[in-house]
């Protein structure tokens, strides 16, 4: 197996570990899905690029309504609470029209009631979209330069030990599993977006990338563009492929999409 293919298979393995569980995954839709995608800057690049990647994969009927706001303003609960904003009205209009097959949102920062925003939107969406699926994109931990120190503060060696705990013990246990129990007829699954940045950062540190990529710097040639960890293009491409596999079930090992990088994502 070549180094390029080995690198690409990392994300196939990640999806097997971190995305939906058996019988809780996406349904296969040969021609594409009609989507409403809402979030912030750790969600937006993947949602926008998904239109390109889905078209390349042959999903001719793929379409999406995209609504974004920065930071916590892009959380599900924030959109819901800001009920008269132009962005929230756009979301409601898209759901009111019916026929939406996937409603994807970013992870919410409401720690006191972590399912509140998601439940509000699911309740709103269901009457006109009874067959809707719900996808929750789980971003990486921000400020990557501090990853290991933050992990060690919680008793873990590094981000690779901490992040699975965040996914399983926080997001799946406290949010996704709760929503699944409350809405047993709705297909609800996670999209492990954050693994793209975490894995590529480690590959860059270990000199396993087949491109000249810095850890921090310009978007076309770096993993991250700033200290907070906003995505360079290689992370956007890898993360979008994770979205494609999570939403459409595509086998990334045989996907022919040209990411523009020598490294097989």
What name fits each language-model region?
Residues 1-18:
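Sec-dependent bacterial lipoprotein signal peptides
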Residues 15-32:
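Bacterial Sec-dependent N-terminal signal peptides
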Residues 18, 39, 231:
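Single, functionally critical "micro-switch" positions that shape active/binding sites
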Residues 34, 38, 42-124:
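Conserved SGNH/GDSL esterase-like catalytic core that processes O-acyl groups on lipids
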Residues 89-233:
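Alpha-helical cap/lid subdomain in secreted, periplasmic
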Residues 210-265:
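Conserved catalytic region of serine esterases and O-acyltransferases that act on ester linkages
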